[in-house]
């Protein structure tokens, strides 16, 4: 981290707060090195008090934000919502709630994020319990949630950045054939509605965490591999729109990857 913190073109580290010990360790590192680190919170890990709480220390979004503020003297922690969207809280899937109810819950969760000082919101519409999602439906849901969150931020005179997903974690890199069309439509909508265009795109790599290891081709990637070629095309597409690429679930990948 020391070596890279002053580099302009480098990979940023995002950490999921899987436990209070993990959160405290991140706070210790950011304080010692005086570097920014992003904490990315799934709705299962940390959830708004309006809907209950998360499994991490039973924290609500509101409580977690206050805890970080009380410990982060140099304001190095960047709070980010990870996988915000319909049915992204496991209780919603378990109870098989309707689309209207999960859509309302998603909005409540995002409002608490905004009120709690989150800087990045991940808009993830990739789950639907009752229908197979077309790319156009996912685009539509991304656009609507970006507009909703943007409007809520404007009411509060705040700003957030958006991350977007079109495929679930672990989806094949072959899905990127739709990517340029999708990003173009989302950017057009944002520009037409005075919404800041997304800053991050969670790219499909086929990579996912299984138990205590990574599955997928990312763990054996090299310059001659097919996945390297596919990911290079994906990254070039993102560069065309000046949107940063983000890879999820890299916990156990080797340094070479």
Task: Identify the function of each model-found stretch.
Residues 1-81, 88, 95-104, 109-110, ...:
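Alpha/beta catalytic barrel-like cores
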Residues 1-4, 41-42, 124-125, 157-162, ...:
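Short amphipathic alpha-helical segments, especially helix-boundary/capping motifs
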